[in-house]
Curated annotation (Swiss-Prot):
Annotated metabolic or biological route of this protein: Secondary metabolite biosynthesis
GO biological processes: biosynthetic process; secondary metabolic process
Documented EC number(s): 3.1.-.-
Family of this protein: Belongs to the AMT4 thioesterase family.
MF annotations from Gene Ontology: hydrolase activity
Function: Thioesterase; part of the gene cluster that mediates the biosynthesis of pyranonigrins, a family of antioxidative compounds. The first step of pyranonigrins biosynthesis is performed by the hybrid PKS-NRPS synthetase that condenses 6 malonyl-CoA units to an acetyl starter unit, to form a 1,3,5-trioxotetradecane-6,8-dienyl-ACP. The enoyl reductase (ER) domain of pynA is likely to be functional during the first two rounds of polyketide chain extension, to generate the saturated C-C bonds of the alkyl side chain. PynA subsequently forms the amide bond between the acyl chain and L-serine.
Gene disruption phenotype: Aabolishes the production of all pyranonigrins.
Protein name as it appears in the record: Thioesterase pynI
Amino acid sequence: MEPILHIQGDAHSSLTPLIFIHAVSGLAWPYMALGNLSNTSDPARSRPVYGISSPVYSSELQPHGPYLLGGWSMGGMIAVKMAEILQAKKETVQQVILLDSINPEKYPAFVNEEEHRIIADGLFTNVCQAMGMADLADDSDDEDNRSDASDASDDGSTMSDEEEEDDNLHRLFSTMRRHIHASTLSISSTEPGKLLPPNSVCHTSVTLVKCTQLSETVPALFSARQRCIRRCALHPTLQWRPQNFDRFRTLLIDARHDSLFDEEHVEEVTSMLRQILESC
């Protein structure tokens, strides 16, 4: 997983960079589908846009504010927490962009470990399929054989370039599987007030890009939990409390959560992001 992914724009631009945080997979690759987020076709004058695989890399990109943060799904949840942490350090966060991100404080906990495992495995399979790597979904956690192959040099043999590339790819997907399991558990165990204290104010503007279509499947096995997740998805602000921010607005898009970066919708998402960034 690349810790910092340069998505587009001039790295030396005087414009404030937009930093996207990874979604549940731990990868920032979905943001690569976005079109030009600058109102210019001149690469030398375009806003730099990055994706990061961990919040800690924001300081490497930008030691001090003002910050522009954003994220899809879990990435938006993390962006809100990052904004609070940065402001506690006296940094300015100009804008947080939530791409269909539900407030995790309202997200229901898993009923049991089995539900968590099944749902996390299902999400992992979906990500693999979206990346055109469906064949890796079933064997990415089979570390023993790959460990033996990686250690082959100990007995004097070496892997071919093709074998090494295959080994690295499987290790990437194994890491992604573990990340999805840890991330889904983290989201479902976020207690009220853990992300933002109820009466606190995070001094930033927040724009929520909300999908109006419900996903075809709900990540839950039990009906009570399914209903709770659907209520969250139908909520006008996806359960965020506008009073927790200086400014909160919602933009609607006729799409489903998992299709935001598909060819059918990505042009509209790009246009929305350009509109948001015009004032930044």
